[in-house]
Regions:
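Catalytic cores of glycan-processing enzymes that make or break glycosidic bonds
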Residues: 1-300
Length: 300
């Protein structure tokens, strides 16, 4: 008999209430965009404080698995990628686009500029809202949006009014709304707020992460071609090469303890944005991989 162990727990559940030291309540877990969700996923549950969990040999996980072993011969680890890194989204965000991998190696201003991209924090980290963007997103409602939701900054550039400068504030403003035109306007405001090129590191204000799928953002569209090329080099290095050894080390702090905790056969749900280091770990620990024909891991 094969069981399933979910990655997350409810932030208001008994696990968090009893042992809050194991959880980070200043963010919410989710997933980057994929073919099924262009804005990413926001699951809402807290992320794990792995530094604290590793101190006692991941006993919180060991206890869960040992209890499961009373009933099951095998189990599937849901979203095993979360043991390498988790997609953490700010509490004031609704969509997943403003998230960042945790842990991750943030980039300094100097490192960003080493790729040939002149770093401008305000322009790259704050929402890019220009007249032409508003016309594209809202059409004939652009003037209404300017009057109600935006403050004029300079020239054709705007900023969100403080009452609407996060997605959660916008969500609250439209709470209970059912008219589709108004919901479309709300979604447009969500899009404005997530239109950044970089997100600031959640722990270190001097480090930055390229925003996931930034190539579809208006702020990217506004770049010169040379800056787009520099950003693409930086982006590809960051998401596909930079973290492999780092995340391998992170996973090996945790998964061997789980695999050795019981005699159950361990299976991994390893779909999604899978870094190269995942099969290094699963093969080394003899954890079975999930293979689905319609979501092949072969890039070819």
């Amino acid at each position: 008999l094969k069981g399933d162990i979910p990655l997350g727990v409810n932030r208001y559940g008994c696990d968090v209430w009893m042992e809050p030291k194991y959880f980070n309540l200043n963010g919410q877990a989710g997933a980057p965009p994929d073919d099924f969700s262009i804005n990413g996923q926001n699951w809402g549950f807290p992320t794990y404080n792995w530094d604290e969990m590793v101190k006692d040999g991941c006993q919180w996980w060991v206890r869960r698995l040992q209890y499961m072993a009373r009933f099951f011969d095998a189990y599937r680890i849901d979203h095993v990628l979360g043991f390498f890194r988790i997609w953490q989204i700010p509490l004031d965000a609704v969509h997943g686009l403003l998230g960042q991998f945790v842990p991750a190696l943030g980039m300094s201003r100097e490192e960003i500029e080493s790729y040939g991209l002149g770093f401008q924090e305000h322009q790259f980290c704050d929402p890019f809202i220009a007249d032409w963007v508003l016309d594209r997103v809202f059409g004939d409602r652009a003037s209404e949006v300017k009057d109600k939701y935006l403050d004029h900054c300079h020239d054709d550039i705007w900023t969100m009014k403080p009452a609407f400068d996060t997605q959660r504030k916008v969500e609250k403003a439209f709470d209970g709304e059912t008219d589709q035109a108004e919901l479309n306007l709300r979604d447009g405001l969500y899009a404005l707020i997530s239109d950044v090129l970089f997100v600031r590191d959640c722990n270190n204000p001097n480090l930055y992460h390229p925003r996931i799928s930034a190539q579809f953002a208006f702020t990217y569209e506004a770049l010169y071609d040379a800056d787009k090329a520099a950003f693409n080099r930086l982006y590809n290095d960051y998401y596909y090469r930079r973290h492999n050894q780092f995340w391998y080390t992170e996973a090996m702090k945790k998964l061997p303890r789980l695999a050795d905790a019981t005699r159950m056969l361990v299976c991994a749900e390893d779909l999604g944005m899978v870094p190269d280091c995942v099969p290094w770990v699963t093969n080394e620990l003899r954890i079975l991989s999930l293979e689905i024909q319609s979501m092949s891991k072969d890039p070819h």
